[in-house]
């Protein structure tokens, strides 16, 4: 089939790779424009853009896909289907209807739970024990389309947003072969979403500051859900310390008190041992203080 692929972050690369490996003709890739990043603030292509360049696939980077010129270009491609994975742009009704079989989206949750921008992070932060990956037929609403294929994935007690996203991206990539095969055979059986919807709102930087008055288990989930970006943090001895991993530990004290130099901090009920500060942060945290 003639496939258009739309995606931007590393999460989307395995899907593009798998679609190519299954012999589909990816005629165009759409991704976000290059952005400034790193200490030198150099313009950097997205991971999907870089992979498409390696594979020799033409790439389009419209600032806003809702503009008529971008949709005109999509119509001219005459694609059978568009595969969308974390593209980061809103597709209009006209765009959704352009490919012969419409636009299919891979989403990192079991819908309708965690519709929106940050389903992986929110699932961990909420203490969910399961999530999943689904491919849906895109509709006008936010992640409201009918489900075409679904896989459940367990969330481990040690999962961070990074490790869970990596696992979901590879599970999702393997789902494209079955989905596109069903598209070719015109054998899709869409299933409407059921149940109460919850929304995975974009992660705000203000959420990264640790509130030690919360229970230890909640904070464990919160910290892992924000790892590695933006990274949870607190102040220890007047210094800002990022905490990427933590686990419940024994100890007593007022919330926010550093119990000892090994990194045990008191919470509302119980304590947390933070286990992965950077060497620089570890040096800062050795003096017992209030977090």
Question: Each predicted region: which residue ranges?
Answer:
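Internal alpha/beta domain cores that form substrate/cofactor-binding pockets in large enzymes
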Residues: 2, 28, 58-77, 90-106
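Donor/substrate-binding cores of folate-linked one-carbon enzymes
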Residues: 22, 32, 81-199
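N-terminal beta-loop-helix "entrance" segment that forms/cooperates
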Residues: 36-49, 53
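Acyl-group handling in specialized metabolite and lipid biosynthesis
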Residues: 201-214
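Positively charged, low-complexity/disordered segments
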Residues: 279-281, 285-291
């Amino acid at each position: 089939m003639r496939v258009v692929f739309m995606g931007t972050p590393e999460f989307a690369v395995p899907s593009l790779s798998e679609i190519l490996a299954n012999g589909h003709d990816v005629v165009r890739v759409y991704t976000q424009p290059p952005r400034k990043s790193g200490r030198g603030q150099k313009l950097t292509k997205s991971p999907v853009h870089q992979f498409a360049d390696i594979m020799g696939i033409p790439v389009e980077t419209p600032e806003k896909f809702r503009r008529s010129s971008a949709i005109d270009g999509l119509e001219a491609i005459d694609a059978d289907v568009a595969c969308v994975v974390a593209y980061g742009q809103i597709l209009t009704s006209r765009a959704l209807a352009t490919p012969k079989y419409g636009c299919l989206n891979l989403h990192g949750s079991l819908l309708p739970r965690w519709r929106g921008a940050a389903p992986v992070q929110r699932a961990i932060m909420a203490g969910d024990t399961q999530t999943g990956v689904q491919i849906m037929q895109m509709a006008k609403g936010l992640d409201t389309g009918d489900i075409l294929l679904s896989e459940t994935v367990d969330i481990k007690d040690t999962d961070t947003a990074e490790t869970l996203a990596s696992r979901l991206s590879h599970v999702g990539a393997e789902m494209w072969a079955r989905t596109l095969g069903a598209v070719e055979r015109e054998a899709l059986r869409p299933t409407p979403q059921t149940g109460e919807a919850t929304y995975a709102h974009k992660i705000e930087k203000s959420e990264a500051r640790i509130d030690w008055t919360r229970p230890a288990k909640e904070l464990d989930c919160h910290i892992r859900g924000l790892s590695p970006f933006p990274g949870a943090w607190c102040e220890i001895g007047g210094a800002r310390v990022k905490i990427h991993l933590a686990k419940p530990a024994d100890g007593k004290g007022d919330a926010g008190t550093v119990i000892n130099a090994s990194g045990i901090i008191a919470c509302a009920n119980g304590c947390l041992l933070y286990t992965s500060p950077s060497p620089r942060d570890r040096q800062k945290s050795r003096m017992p203080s209030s977090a």
